[in-house]
Regions:
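Short, solvent-exposed aromatic-acidic interface loops
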Residues: 12, 218-223, 572-574
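Small/flexible residues
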Residues: 4-7, 36, 517-521
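Phosphate/oxyanion-binding loops and surfaces in catalytic or ligand/nucleic-acid-binding neighborhoods
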Residues: 16, 209, 577
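Membrane-proximal, glycine/serine-rich, low-complexity loop/turn segments characteristic
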Residues: 24-261, 271-284, 430-433, 639-645, ...
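Bacterial Sec-dependent N-terminal signal peptides
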Residues: 1-32, 316, 620, 645, ...
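Exposed, low-structure sequence patches enriched in small/polar residues
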Residues: 253, 257-657
Length: 657
């Protein structure tokens, strides 16, 4: 244990010192007067930088397969509403505190999201919302090096240490790493866990953006213990002792270590050059000097010649990506799931839209996959896949119509074939596309992947593919209002019963959903609200709460002539009662039950954020109302109570060299 602490301390210190060991590299301004290659007399070529480095110093974007442009970039800033600490009660997105690894085992989200793209589904996977995956790591483009150091803790034994650094070591070439050490404290046990998360990324954009390359390494080491599952709910509701250790649970000694590794590399090259042309014109102007003499000045005028638009079906950009994903579980059953995949794609969407918006954007590709599962060294199953995909976007005046489709075909099975087809119409009300109206329709067909005995797959040929048909609309007004409504038709829906056997619905059902997100501001007062309204025509197949809400009311002010920024406010969460699925810790499965309802309880937090130059401080009183509750009824799931009152605090330093 002492050696492990020493290794951990040394690693954190090295990560903290890395920003000072790397020399700052700043992207130089592009020299438009430099001649590059043969050109027409009087013309000069202005090569383009990636959009992400044009508008600021530090930006990041997320990995997306078959992407050749930085479509959206984000800037690290002060996070309001106390979100610096992992929220163990984000039930809307399905994050609950059921295990002491990270911030809790995921639950089925209160607001299901049907129609999502096809992907490998692993039931019982630990913490997909918190663990690092290729889909949520960050790639950066920076003008100056950027570093981040953070420490978060509580009055219990929780703590989080994070160190991150990114910089462009040469124009267009960025390297970065992000390491997090977590020690979440057990709620109902005296044990604790130490978890490690690390990702290292690099990406390169040539000066004209034609050559692009990305690579990433992602590693997780997560310990998961049983952290609840009361054998007697009355012991919790009637006992007001703050010492939860020793509370009777279902499987007290269940624990395992998850060790995950993912690798990704990709490169793409555009056959279409990207540049603007400039012509210099010199003119002579005469003016009267102070001594009444005529002074002649040479005035240089630069004309921008419109870019020569390529053909709609141009040569486009070609790319290839390869990935390796390993998820290993030891100590309980030594299960290992691995997937090898590649992606070959072509797209004619190579110009940034502010330069030239292609009226017909086409992306096509194919993605072969190979997956297999081992338990204790014995291969239990493997499967080869071939996944073709296509996406077409057509400009219709100011708006656009997008159609996309993908398939997952098991090469060694004639019956296994998944598919997804979607169509979206987007109409922007302004040129900046800040106010939009969107309508969509999505159809999916997915064969159930039932991962029982942890990651071992138990296929049942009797089960029909789960088919969904979704129609919906969404209205966005800047960042103030986001309203969406949708209706989804389910056929052959599949779930687990109380005996952990798969059950298929004999009748179809409808799920109606509405989501309203608002960010209101009146001077220095802010009110962020998220309201969910749902109705399932068959709650036995699809149990959901009728109403859920998440609200943040806070003041955001600057003090001492803008030197200090402060945010003081409250968070409130609530959802109506419903028959929530229950959790089985041994298999990691959620199964339907009709004996106990959860919900009908309000959770309240109070937080204070302070930002002084590049340092951010926060304190947060989590679940403050638990201090005066007459009876403990704050269950997240049947037999799984939530955490009581907890006091969190933390500090984050950001360095722009």
């Amino acid at each position: 244990m002492r050696v492990q602490r020493v290794y951990t301390f040394v690693l954190v210190m090295l990560l903290a010192a890395a920003p000072h060991c790397l020399r700052a590299q700043v992207n130089p301004q592009i020299d438009t007067a430099r001649n590059e290659g043969p050109q027409v007399r009087g013309l000069e070529y202005h090569k383009e930088e990636p959009d992400s480095v044009k508008r600021g110093k530090v930006y990041y974007f997320f990995y997306s397969p078959a992407q050749t442009k930085i479509n959206a970039v984000l800037h690290p800033s002060l996070s309001p509403t106390g979100a610096q600490f992992n929220d163990a009660l984000d039930a809307i997105n399905g994050n609950y505190y059921l295990g002491i690894g990270v911030a809790g085992h995921p639950h089925l989200a209160l607001y299901p999201t049907p129609g999502t793209p096809l992907a490998s589904s692993l039931i019982g996977e630990p913490f997909p919302a918190y663990a690092k995956r290729l889909g949520n790591v960050r790639f950066y483009q920076t003008r100056t090096p950027y570093s981040l150091l953070a420490y978060h803790s509580s009055l219990n034994n929780d703590y989080v240490v994070r160190a991150a650094h990114t910089q462009n070591i040469m124009p267009g070439w960025n390297v970065s790493f992000d390491y997090t050490l977590m020690r979440p404290d057990g709620i109902y046990t005296a044990t604790y866990a130490k978890d490690h998360f690390l990702d290292a990324t690099t990406n390169y954009f040539s000066q004209d953006s034609r050559l692009q390359a990305k690579a990433a390494v992602v590693w997780n080491s997560i310990r998961n213990d049983e952290n609840g599952g009361l054998t007697d709910d009355g012991y919790f509701t009637g006992n007001y002792s703050t010492n939860y250790a020793g509370m009777p649970v279902n499987i007290y000694n269940l624990q395992s270590r998850h060790n995950d590794l993912a690798l990704m590399g990709g490169v793409s090259y555009s056959l279409v050059p990207q540049f603007e042309q400039y012509r210099h014109r010199d003119s002579i102007a005469a003016s009267m000097g102070a001594d009444s003499t005529v002074v002649y000045d040479t005035i240089e005028v630069i004309d921008t010649i419109p870019l020569r638009q390529p053909h709609v079906l141009n040569a486009g950009s070609w790319g290839v990506e390869v990935t390796y994903d390993r998820r290993k579980r030891v100590a309980v059953d030594s299960t290992m799931w691995r997937e090898y995949s590649a992606c070959l794609f072509w797209t004619n969407d190579v110009y940034p839209d502010h330069r030239w918006r292609n009226p017909l954007k086409v992306t096509v590709g194919i993605q072969p996959r190979y997956t297999f599962v081992d338990i204790a060294g014995d291969t239990l199953g493997y499967r080869s896949w071939l996944d073709p995909f296509a996406r077409v976007e057509v400009a219709l005046g100011r708006g656009s119509l997008t159609a996309e489709g993908e398939m997952r075909k098991a090469l060694m099975s004639t019956s296994r074939q998944d598919s997804r087809f979607a169509a979206t119409f987007l109409f922007p009300f302004d040129s900046a596309r800040a106010t939009t109206l969107e309508a969509k329709a999505v159809m999916t067909s997915r064969t159930p992947e039932l991962m029982l005995v942890h990651f071992a797959e138990r296929s049942n040929s009797v089960l029909e593919p789960v088919k969904t048909a979704l129609v919906g609309a969404q209205f966005r007004y800047k960042d103030v209002v986001d309203l969406s409504v949708q209706a989804t038709h389910y056929d052959h829906n599949t779930w687990f019963d109380t005996t952990l056997l798969a059950v298929e619905g004999t009748a179809p059902l409808w799920l109606y959903q509405a989501r309203l997100t608002t960010r209101l501001r009146l001077g220095w007062m802010h009110l962020d609200m998220q309201h969910l309204l749902q109705h399932s025509t068959d709650t036995a197949q699809m149990p959901v709460p009728m109403f859920a809400t998440k609200n943040s009311l806070y003041a955001d002010v600057t003090l001492f002539r803008g030197a200090l920024r402060a945010q003081l406010g409250v968070d409130i969460r609530y959802h109506t009662m419903f028959y929530s699925p229950n959790y089985d810790p041994y298999t990691g499965l959620f199964y339907h039950q009709r004996t106990a309802r959860v919900g009908g309880y309000l959770w309240g937090d109070v937080f204070l954020n302070l930002q002084l130059k590049r340092a951010s401080f926060y304190v947060k009183a989590g679940h403050l109302n638990a201090l005066w509750e007459e009876e403990r009824k704050y269950f997240l799931l049947p037999h799984y109570p939530g955490r009581g009152f907890a006091f969190f605090y933390g500090i984050t330093w950001k360095f722009f060299d």
